[in-house]
């Protein structure tokens, strides 16, 4: 067992006079990154150093900026203190590795894209960052830095992909970001998809202009004014290139590259009905179509990246579903890197050594130092884009969730590996899907219900390693992407729910609610169509050039199904077309109870009934895909007859993604947004950020594990995060009102830890909870001397006395299940040989904690239990304790 004493201190909790709510007392309650890293996540931008072959940066779609100084073996997050985590572009100053530029907001605008707030710059290798402007651009595609003048930089901004915006185009600075000029502007609906600068003559710059706008049910990629633009004065002015071999008609996304060894050679990936890859050998004066091979660019709006070998103008790479290579100037291509995760978004080639490359893809990154013959990658980036999280009732409890691009994964909340929560404990219930929901059966956590995109539902039995396909309705119509003629429609994120009153009943959402009571063998609808069923919104997505029919834009479907714990038969439903529906009789009758003022095309991601109060439910709507980026959240206390908006105090442009009422404190509510978690102690009347030590990231789901009282978050960019033992959070208002308080410790387990080494799995280890019993107390002001926390056994005898922290606010120490240590051997000079720091490990049973705070003594009882898998009896544990206690008495007598 680990013998440790770990302390952390929370800040002072103050009362908000208007609401009686605890406002800032939870600022130092810490979140714990739980992983996993085994699946990686989408990397949108990569950059390396020409001078230092071990230095790399990468930007994640929703997971911030990461830096490696050892050739990719270890990565550290360097952007976690900033206000956003979505990254579109990363660039290292060619003249100074310490200067790094970051453009925020991913520019691959699929349905789960996250926004940014402009351009950041670091001059100390990522230690600190300064936002240098362009805050309203939202999605940045590329940053170019002049190798001859580091004060000269050009930024390509795609701009708001959900609405027309004046902040689209190319922006130029000549003073290192102090001031900016918008120099390429073709209208509010078109931005810049890519930029390329001539290495030898940096005044020559090419830009791809792209019209793109997304709606919840479709998107438009391409417009009349799109096309290729060129500047010969460093981006001050631009000229559109037309004719001379370039495609006619509407064009869409464009990817660009200039051959460093022959700057007259320019490559352009152009979304067009007339081809895919064009090449110019004369500085863009004339062009030729060199490839119409879809291997080069299979989904233009999502990929469209091209790169050229610095030493060979005919050696070309393209990033698409596969990484492709040409050695004949783009005429023919072959797929490479077959052992690397697919869906490639970024390529960087060392300018002085074309054998060294790094690529970014949907599973993270991959590196080569031999021109792509072999690739290395480590499962050490916890940047998973989870949609939902499901929690088991086992011990340690199982955590499951579905990830964009990377299946569903399940793992332990608390690893029994002393090294931490490594990738070794995580497993994929079903492979080969974009994961969405994954929930352990409440009766047996070894049975996992999970689904992939478009309603592909599976049941996985971990013990026997069997899986069953259990989708209620399978139709070739939906498989052929013509959902308008299908009787049932399933969302990219089709919801799964268990009835709280009978976990044998499982619900699955299409456009109706399906139910099964026999483990998914048979299903029946328990509702009519609960959506708007707007046929105009059920047509194939994409266009006008390329259709994109993956199912990500399927609409008029159900997003959430939740049953009320306090009322049998009460089921709440949220849809992706702006409805909240309710039944109070198990589905026999339904009522539309949508909050007034809801966006008719918004997504009700969560409708969460209170686990404590009848008739109370919270709803959150995300309407960003309609161009409405404001927060939307409501509460009802009368079954939806009346709703109250609860967005007071939230930033006006903060997308709302999830909501969850607390399971102990009826006034406490948690709100997940695009940039972190918020909490309210007055049912949503006022909000305070609960981000604390967590990076800015999209919070897609919020759950509470009731046995351990842990708050668990599904983030869309940084995997799973946990706040352990949230009773101090739940009872913060009472503590502040009392002036001092000892919170009741939770039941804790003497887990038997092991040291596990599993090859690549040791590349990543998330922190386990501190080993032992967390003991938390609140004091309004510090005392003259630090409080002593005394651990008592069931008879009232002292087991151990611990010196606590002495700060105003919440303080926490962890008792590690051990009795007082023996007296140190002071006759030995070397402290390592003076005796152990801990006494014998105690026997599971009843204990209490006692502490005096500002003249008052508090006692709270708690239980210590054995490892659930332990075979040793309590009598055997007692004998072991007696032996070690006797040895400690002998140790204590050595100096006497």
Question: Which residue stretches match the model-derived regions?
Answer:
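Extracytoplasmic/secretory ectodomains and luminal regions
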Residues: 733-896
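Bacterial N-terminal signal peptides
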Residues: 6-17
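Beta-propeller blade termini and top-face loops
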Residues: 21-763, 770-772, 782
């Amino acid at each position: 067992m680990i013998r440790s004493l770990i302390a952390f201190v929370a800040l002072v909790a103050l009362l908000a006079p208007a609401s009686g709510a605890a406002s800032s007392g939870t600022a130092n309650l810490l979140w714990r990154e739980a992983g996993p890293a085994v699946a990686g996540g989408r990397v949108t931008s990569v950059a390396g150093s020409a001078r230092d072959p071990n230095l790399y940066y990468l930007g994640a779609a929703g997971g911030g900026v990461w830096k490696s100084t050892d050739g990719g073996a270890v990565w550290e997050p360097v952007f976690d203190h900033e206000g956003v985590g979505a990254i579109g572009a990363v660039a290292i100053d060619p003249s100074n590795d310490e200067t790094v530029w970051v453009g925020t907001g991913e520019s691959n605008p699929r349905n789960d894209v996250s926004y940014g707030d402009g351009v950041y710059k670091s001059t100390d290798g990522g230690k600190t960052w300064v936002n240098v402007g362009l805050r309203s651009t939202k999605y940045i595609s590329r940053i170019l830095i002049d190798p001859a003048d580091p004060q000269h930089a050009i930024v390509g901004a795609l701009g708001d992909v959900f609405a027309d915006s004046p902040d689209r185009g190319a922006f130029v600075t000549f003073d290192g970001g102090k001031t900016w000029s918008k120099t390429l502007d073709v209208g509010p609906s078109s931005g810049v998809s890519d930029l390329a600068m001539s290495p030898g003559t940096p005044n020559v710059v090419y830009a791809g202009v792209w019209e793109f706008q997304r709606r919840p049910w479709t998107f438009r990629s391409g417009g009349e004014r799109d096309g290729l633009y060129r500047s010969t004065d460093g981006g001050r002015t631009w000229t559109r290139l037309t004719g001379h071999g370039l495609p006619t008609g509407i064009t869409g996304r464009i990817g660009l590259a200039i051959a460093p060894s022959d700057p007259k050679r320019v490559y352009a990936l152009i979304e067009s009905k007339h081809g895919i890859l064009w090449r110019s050998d004369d500085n863009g004066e004339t062009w030729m179509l060199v490839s119409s091979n879809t291997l080069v660019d299979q989904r233009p709006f999502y990929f469209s990246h091209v790169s050229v070998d610095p030493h060979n103008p005919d050696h070309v790479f393209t990033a698409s579903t596969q990484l492709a290579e040409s050695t004949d100037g783009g005429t023919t291509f072959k797929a490479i890197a077959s052992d690397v995760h697919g869906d490639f978004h970024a390529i960087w080639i060392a300018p002085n050594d074309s054998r060294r490359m790094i690529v970014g893809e949907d599973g993270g990154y991959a590196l080569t130092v031999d021109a792509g013959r072999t690739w290395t990658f480590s499962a050490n980036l916890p940047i998973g884009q989870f949609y939902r999280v499901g929690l088991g009732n086992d011990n340690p409890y199982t955590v499951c969730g579905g990830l964009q691009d990377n299946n569903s994964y399940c793992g332990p909340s608390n690893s029994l590996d002393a090294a931490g929560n490594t990738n070794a404990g995580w497993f994929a219930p079903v492979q080969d899907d974009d994961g969405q929901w994954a929930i352990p059966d409440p009766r047996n956590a070894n049975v996992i219900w999970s689904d992939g995109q478009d309603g592909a539902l599976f049941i996985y039995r971990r013990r026997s390693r069997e899986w069953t396909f259990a989708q209620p309705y399978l139709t070739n119509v939906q498989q052929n992407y013509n959902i308008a003629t299908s009787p049932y429609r399933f969302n990219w994120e089709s919801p799964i729910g268990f009835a709280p009153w009978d976990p044998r009943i499982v619900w699955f959402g299409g456009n109706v609610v399906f139910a099964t009571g026999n483990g998914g063998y048979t299903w029946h609808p328990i509702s009519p169509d609960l959506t708007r069923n707007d046929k105009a919104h059920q047509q194939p997505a994409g266009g006008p050039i390329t259709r994109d029919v993956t199912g990500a834009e399927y609409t008029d479907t159900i997003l959430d199904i939740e049953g009320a714990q306090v009322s049998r038969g009460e089921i709440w439903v949220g849809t992706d077309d702006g409805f909240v529906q309710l039944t109070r009789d198990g589905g026999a009758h339904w009522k539309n109870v949508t909050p007034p003022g809801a966006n008719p095309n918004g997504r009700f991601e969560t409708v969460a009934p209170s686990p404590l109060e009848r008739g109370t439910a919270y709803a959150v709507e995300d309407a960003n895909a309609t161009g409405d980026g404001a927060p939307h959240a409501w509460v009802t206390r009368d079954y939806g007859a009346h709703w109250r908006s609860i967005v007071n105090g939230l930033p006006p442009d903060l997308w709302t993604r999830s909501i969850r009422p607390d399971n102990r404190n009826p006034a406490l509510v948690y709100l997940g947004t695009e940039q972190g978690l918020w909490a309210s102690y007055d049912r949503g009347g006022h909000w305070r950020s609960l981000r604390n030590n967590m990076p800015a990231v999209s919070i897609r789901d919020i759950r509470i594990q009731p046995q351990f009282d842990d708050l668990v978050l599904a983030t869309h960019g940084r995997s799973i995060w946990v706040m352990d033992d949230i009773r101090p959070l739940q009872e913060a208002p009472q503590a502040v009102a009392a002036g001092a308080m000892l919170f009741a410790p939770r039941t804790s387990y003497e887990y038997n830890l092991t040291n596990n080494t599993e090859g690549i799995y040791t590349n990543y280890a998330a922190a386990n909870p501190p080993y032992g019993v967390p003991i938390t107390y609140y004091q309004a002001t510090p005392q003259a001397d630090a409080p002593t926390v005394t651990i008592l056994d069931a008879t009232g005898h002292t087991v151990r006395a611990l010196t606590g922290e002495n700060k105003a606010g919440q303080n926490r120490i962890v008792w590690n299940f051990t009795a007082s240590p023996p007296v140190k051997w002071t006759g030995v000079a070397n402290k390592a040989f003076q005796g152990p720091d801990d006494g014998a490990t105690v026997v599971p049973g009843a204990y209490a904690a006692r502490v005096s705070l500002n003249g008052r003594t508090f006692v709270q009882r708690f239980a210590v239990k054995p490892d659930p898998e332990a075979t040793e009896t309590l009598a055997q544990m007692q004998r072991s304790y007696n032996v070690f206690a006797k040895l400690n008495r002998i140790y204590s007598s050595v100096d006497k």
